[in-house]
Amino acid sequence: MAFRTEPILTPKFRARWTRLAEPDEKGKFSITMLFPKDANLKPLKDMVIACIKGEWGDKFKPSQLSLPLKDGNEKINAETGDVYAEYVDTIWATASTKYAVTVLDATKGKKPIPTAELKSAVYDGCYCIAQISAYSWEYKDDKTGKVIKRGVSLRLENLLKYADGEPIGGGKKYDAADAFADIAADADDPGNYQTEEKGSDWDL
């Protein structure tokens, strides 16, 4: 049976590859966490080490295992040969779970975010804090039954959207309340379109 640690809270991170409203093709909900290189990740690293020792004792060194924390400067775009911009000078990790997690919004009094709003509320580029735990795993060869790979992964327990941020890969995010603030409830026209003048270059 896999060893699993007690959960901890992460430092604030930038969200990437958020999959929280519905599971992926493997049936998992997940989020990739981009931590600044200077973030205090000692509690997270200690949790991973505790998981290693809890499962295998001193039998394996961390370098012999697949571990969740990765160097962002090694996340290379195969087409350009450059580091993906959002990964530069970061440490990143992915946390996942088979179960839908509760997501709170710190920008709105830590109220739960409805599932229908998760895709727009927790987007790539916003900032979050996660409650995560670590668990051990081993992959065995189907024919021989021998272990061919072992490691530690992170389980997503709960999530807090901490703050908005610059969206990654999707352009600027506009606030709906601001966009429609001047529209009356019974308005037929947005108010900024005047009577059309015929004869312009833009006639259709």
Model-predicted segments: where are they?
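Acidic, gly/ser/pro-rich intrinsically disordered tails
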Residues: M1-T5, E166-L204
